[in-house]
Amino acid sequence: MTPSVDSLLLGAAAAAAVVLGLGWLAHRVLLLGLKAPRVPHDCGPHDLGLPAASVRELSIAGMRGKRLFAWLVTPDVATAAPHPAVLVMHGWGSNAAMMLPVVAPLREAGFSVLLLDARCHGRSDDEDFASMPRFAEDIAAGLGVLRAQPGVDPGRIGLIGHSVGAAATLLHASRDPAVRAVVSISAFAHPGELMRAWLSRARIPYPVIGWAILRHVERTIGARFAAIAPLATVRRVGCPVLLVHGRHDATVPFSDAERLAAAAPHATLLAVDGDHDLRDALAPFTDELVAFLIAATRAPALADA
């Protein structure tokens, strides 16, 4: 869960600014700016001491013929069917291995866990660019496979995401009423606000130049920031949402989490003493996170309650 949001903003803003004068060539530069640095896995589920039979590597069919890498971790046979499952999505410039701290507690609680590499990340296929909507597309592809796994109850599925991955889980859940729970870790409230703050720090004036940069990024990713912003999508999510955020987050301010909590009809805010990368800071709250997912996937769906 390494924070790399600034690299996304830097690449997008710098490249898009050039687009204003250099056309096609500069647009190609923008696409490079919208690709995160690929970080290789430095560990895997087997390093957690799990039984070999409980871990499988999957190759999942994604959009536009791309293949997505994933690890599927299953619970003990005694609790294997039927049981809930969770898809876990990393953040920008990260990969599935960096989300491993949540795996063992979830497996012990009887969940199957799908750890997914988004396109342009980890061991998944490359693409012309990465974006939050494309993260959401990859989540949809992963869920299709997860729901079809033997023993998995397709009606008891939760999502966990970090940073851009958290925003993507909220975007997907706002469109998929079958999702039963979302754990959003270090999500930003609005991508446009995040980029405008970066433009201000870089002393790029918003009128004309900054505005044009943001509009070009929207055209490139095929979505308006206002439509995909967590501040908008969290209002449309019909399942319980746990918003986890570090009080000392220097990448996405804690106030973003407070705004999301105020906007969400079924949200709970969990504040932890940490920064944007919460792998270590989350350890004391693992039981709370697992309890939330157990309650949400056991209870009747909110839409049916």
PLM segments and residue spans:
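Alpha/beta-hydrolase active-site loop
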Residues: 129-150
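An N-terminal hydrophobic leader/cap segment in hydrolases
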Residues: 2-61, 71
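Hydrolase active-site cap/lid region
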Residues: 171-223, 232, 271
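Alpha/beta-hydrolase fold nucleophile elbow
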Residues: 151-162
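Short beta-strand/loop motif that positions the catalytic acidic residue
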Residues: 236-238, 243-245, 249
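Conserved alpha/beta-hydrolase "acid-adjacent" motif
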Residues: 250-256, 281
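Catalytic histidine-centered segment of alpha/beta-hydrolase-like enzymes
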Residues: 275-286
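Conserved alpha/beta-hydrolase
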Residues: 103-125
